[in-house]
Amino acid sequence: MTGYGLRVLVTAASRHGATQEIAVAIASRLTESPAGRAAGLTAVAVPVGQDADPSGFTAVVLGSAVYAGRWLESARTYAATRAGGLRQRPVWLFSSGPIGEPPFPPDEPHDVAAMLQLTGAHGHRVFPGRLEKARLGFGERAMVTAMRAPLGDFRNWTDINAWADDIAAELVGATTAPAVGRP
């Protein structure tokens, strides 16, 4: 079997757009990575709210913004509703949300262990997010002010691209490796 024809769905839940921008960057990098180009890999980024069916894809990258230590409800619902299809293909998870230097909070979201088990994912990465007051609602702005949360874009595109490169290499390697017991 060759790596040609690999299709990857990158789907994410985003409240203010930063996590969806990460999903778009991951999809783009999967396609443009050295392994992705060599194998003809294609990836698409679809907001999780569109409930994309994973069955037409070789692999899935599922992500969510994190608020109050948890994934957004739409991402949790997608994982639960699509668990059967997700478990039949390679899946990777990512979270976006910590802010500042160093990123805070440093811990993984509370529900990641359950998401890993539910989806059978190969792994999970936490990426720093973006916090801009202009994109927040009144209640969110009040909370940010009270917490003295640092404002800014803390996303590290080099780390995001490197992770996508690793996923592409793993996918291409898995589809081009000879079967066990065959010459």
Predicted regions and their residues:
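FMN-binding flavodoxin-like domain, especially the glycine-rich phosphate-binding loop
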Residues: G3-Y4, E21, S33-R37, A59, ...
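N-terminal beta1-alpha1 ligand-phosphate binding loop
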Residues: T2-G36
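Structured loop/turn residues at secondary-structure junctions
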Residues: S14, V66-Y67
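Short, charge-patterned binding micro-sites
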Residues: D51-A52, G63-S64
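A short beta-strand-loop structural module common to alpha/beta enzyme folds
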Residues: S33-D51
